[in-house]
Amino acid sequence: MINTLSNIYKQQGNEIIDKIFNDHLIVSEQIDGSRFLFQKLPDNTIVYYKKDGEQINYIDRTLMKFYENAITFIENMPIAIKVNLPDYWTFGFQYFPSSAPINIVYDRMPKNHLILTDISIRNEVGRTTKVIHDAKVLRDWAAKIDVEQPPIIFNGRLSDFQKSQLKRFLETPDEDLIQLFKTQSFTRYIISILNPKLTSSALVS
């Protein structure tokens, strides 16, 4: 979010930032996992996808075992859960085959190797008609599927203090930010503004 806001601020200035800051915001921590998705079809078939939207087929599964933990978990979900998955809903996750799925080493694994991040509703031809980011909906589905809830840092409207602190950050020259974050965690700094009650980032002790 912050990198995106920084680019918007540099290109379009305060006016667009003020508009964004006055809206209802949902801010999630970006997790360094691998993208994994599944979709239930009307015949109760489950289809799996990689990060690029390409389907994971049986040949992929035979030659590449990378997604097996996630696929096996979904395949073994209780029937009562599977049949109640809405048709054509596609559940998106950050997948952890290990505690270091890409570059960052995390202190713990997410529940059943998966963090639910989004749900997209598609039609019969595969076109996305709606994307669900609502925090409550995602939390409810994460509980039903039995995976880690999305790491939501903030959900609501910013206070004047939060707006001023974030603006101050955006207005700070890049070279000063580089110097600052040699000694201070960028993630912890942003969390301290958005949600001071959080004592650590997701999957980190």
Feature-to-residue mapping (PLM):
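Core nucleotide-handling region used for phosphoryl-transfer chemistry
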Residues: M1-S205
